[in-house]
Amino acid sequence: MSDAVGGVYPRVDMSGGTNVFPDMERQVLEYWKDDETFKASLTNREENPEYVFYDGPPFANGLPHYGHLLTGYVKDIVPRYQTMKGKLVNRVFGWDCHGLPAELEAEKQLGIKDKGEIEAMGLESFNNYCAKSVLEYTQEWKDYVTRQARWVDFDNGYKTMDMDFMESVMWAFKTLYDKGLIYQGFRVLPYSWAEHTPLSNQETRLDDSYKMRQDPTLTVTFPITGVKDDSAADASLVGAYALAWTTTPWTLPSNLALAVNPQVNYVEVKVGDQGAEAIRGQRVLLAEALVGAYAKELGEDHEVLTVRPGSELVGLTYQPIFSYFADHENAFQILAAEYVTTEDGTGIVHQAPAFGEDDMNTCKEYGIEVVIPVDMDGKFTSLVPEYQGQLVFDANKSIIADLKAAGRVVRHQTIEHSYPHSWRSGEPLIYMALPSWFVEVTKIRDRMVELNKEIDWMPSHIRDGQFGKWLEGARDWNISRNRYWGSPIPVWVSDDENYPRVDVYGSLEELERDFGVRPESLHRPHIDELTRPNPDDPTGKSTMRRVPEVLDCWFESGSMPFAQKHYPFENKDWFDTHSPADFIVEYSGQTRGWFYTLHVLATALFDRPAFKKVVAHGIVLGDDGTKMSKSRRNYPDVNEVFNRDGSDAMRWFLMSSPILRGGNLIVTEQGIREGVRQALLPMWNAYSFLQLYSSKPAQWSVDSSDVLDRYILAKLHDVVAAVGDALDNTDIARACDEVRTFCDALTNWYVRRSRDRFWAGDTEHPEAFYTLYTVLETLTRVTAPLLPMVSEVIWRGLTGERSVHLADFPQADQFPADDDLVRAMDEVRGVCSATSSVRKAHKLRNRLPLPKVTVALPESARLADFADIIRDEVNVKEVALTSDVDSVGRFDVVVNAKVAGPRLCKDVQRAIKAVKSGNYERRGDTVVADGIELVAGEFTERLVAADPDSTTQIDGVDGLVVLDMTLTEELEAEGWAADVIRGLQDARKASGFEVSDRIEVKLVVPEEKKEWALRHTDMIAGEVLATSFEVVTGEPAEHDIVAGVTATVQKV
């Protein structure tokens, strides 16, 4: 063994003298800051091809959370990797500033309860406060992003409230308007009464928008009074009651019609004596298919009088349920509407056109004008005086009571259903007819679907599934908000309808041209103050005034690719070469949010996708499997994790999980610590091992002839190729899997099996040191994007150079590939692992030698060259190889009927029968039974062994090991000696000796063990570097070695 070891590494010490990862990370972060390493990574590549990454802007009026942490790690890994592959990757950070989130937070801080208080405060004061509060937590965000080792450019970032950004948004609106893709319409929209603004359909599909809610449902009567003059309806139905069902009783005061499906059969039923009081003995009309659903209300003795299609009910008139709009033109008749179904209710649908899109469209066909007795606060107006001033949901109780008193209620129930709520305030929405501005998405919908085919999605099923289906059903996008803090809708209209005119502006220059002043702010109220005489008014009395709405903040975030660079007013060439982006990432809910608005605007403005590749990850959940909640404290504090385990551990935990393939992830402290065990510790331990035994700097070499060196270098070839391929395809979880597997081979096999060569030293075995150095130097370049800080510490410690993040990602062809060796050695590892599992099951310690292990697998001869390794690793005297697997056991196939049944249906029983009779064969990863293919998961394999207690399967191959566990006195003595060696090594360590120190040993043993000690003196002394070794009996010595054995150890 070499006398001089250690002291060569680290070439540069970034550990700060500690092996605590969070402490190392702080050293690395400080170094990067002082060295300006991120800036150098950009400067080094500035002449290279660019990899374009768009960073979705967060709001800075709240603190970041695990969702931001997860997305941020991906946003760091991909650019780091692409940089190491030779690309220039700019990472500009932006801030989302406008919209409801900002206003609501400002209202909360100011104690404002409604819009009236904002207007009393003054728009300028309110918006100034919003501008300040929206950036309240920017420093916390910067600290957080920096601590997670994410490299971003804060200095050249953008804010959506900047004048340049807002001007680009104006340009986008004007361009869409000129293309005929923007219009003002009056439509039923999801409306937030709490925030006084309509929302877009996609906003009602965002996370947390739908919540479970209990609401009353009513079935009420509408007495038939006559027949319209132009109708063929049967007058004999006059006096019958049409039954209609609703889940929104508050809309009944606005009822103007009923609707039936002309293709559905309806019945006239005579209600029995046991029927509901409101209809007892009366004739009622409802869908034939729903009679059973109303059996109780109709009474057991009810009688079906007539059956007729819905088309023969159209044109019947009825008595209004309330008299508020009794004289409304064309109202209170039964209409035809094919959307009416018999899935629930009565098959007759009450129509309140102000509060239902289908209702509005149907009533419009019949010339029924909309009436809206609800104000912007969601409260009834003077049009319905009995309920005036009541919030519509609160009015349900009074309305139901009044209808019951009038004898109009047939059934009153309560249902719990999923109902849309405001994604920001959390209050339930209502659907109400409102004037709004729309992007006519339906005009470009087909093109959006086509362009989506060009996008590479991770997970792939989202393209044609969640996102593709949404695109296929995309509706016109409501982009106006009746709010204050946002980009203005750049439309000016005449204030005199006798002289109509509409002007739309797309630049500051256009505004200056018409208004004679260049705006210093595009925010309200300044932009509202721009007025001018109407050029189309010869009287000169009318004025052009801006419409009061502001833009949906999602329009701004969708404009980010071009607005961040003030396109098209500046950087036109830049944008033309930076769109579409090579890569974006957010959570999967953004298929209704940012991904969608990016796609809409890119299609409408540029006729191309906004991005080429996108990762849509799943949701981070608390440790109880539910949404993270501060009140429930169901997740570990992020800063505590950073301080205890480190950011690299958190990064590994999140990035190696199924969440990046669209699944959800439960965050637990144990899971985070597992990241340390799986990747950080194996790398660090291998590096520490090299540090410990190196007496001189190692060289980068791939030329060793030693079989273990050849194996680990071939594995290195494979992991470089596999991780590169995974990261090329943004499959970060697979990259982590590959690294984890390699680290296991490196530390639990290569280093451990090579210990004797390292103990002998780098003069006697330089190839071992060269190989481990080469592996670690390469591995840290592979892991640099995945584990940026520990990789930096190890790589700089090995090389002394500036930063691993300024190095190139390795090329697989730099290393010798050897598929046959890797396959064979991996099988050897499998054999050893299987053998150890049998030992463990029988509680036979590894230091106890056993007589024999039989390895049975096809083509077993290929392991003959490795028999000595197996023998030494599993501590047996003999290794027997056989290809006759059937002589020691077999594998029976068992069909998993629960899994296979849904796909195979009746054929599953045929497959089960065939497998039981042996009529099947293995074909790769499948089983074919009587011609029926069973895929992975639809079957399992069960080992049937000749000697079950001593036999187990070799993982990953169709092979078995059989361990002979017969013990002899000789084997037990040798095992005891090995235990003594371990105990003496522990005594050396406890005494503070260096690994190369020679020692003197006096071993005190029981009389019955003295002969065993003397028999194995040479072996024990050699292993513990004892120049003097004495075996005695008598009084116990200083160090406990094994049961009944003590020792004195002294340094020579």
From Swiss-Prot:
Catalysed transformations (reactions): tRNA(Ile) + L-isoleucine + ATP = L-isoleucyl-tRNA(Ile) + AMP + diphosphate
EC number: 6.1.1.5
Disulfide bonds: none
Residue positions binding ATP: K630
Gene3D superfamilies: HUPs (3.40.50.620), Isoleucyl-tRNA Synthetase, Domain 1 (1.10.730.10)
Main location: cytoplasm
GO biological process, one term: isoleucyl-tRNA aminoacylation
Domain notes: IleRS has two distinct active sites: one for aminoacylation and one for editing. The misactivated valine is translocated from the active site to the editing site, which sterically excludes the correctly activated isoleucine. The single editing site contains two valyl binding pockets, one specific for each substrate (Val-AMP or Val-tRNA(Ile)).
Oligomer status and interactors: Monomer.
NCBIfam families named among the record's database cross-references: ileS
Protein's name according to its UniProt entry: Isoleucine--tRNA ligase
Record organism: Corynebacterium diphtheriae (strain ATCC 700971 / NCTC 13129 / Biotype gravis)
Recorded name of the encoding gene: ileS
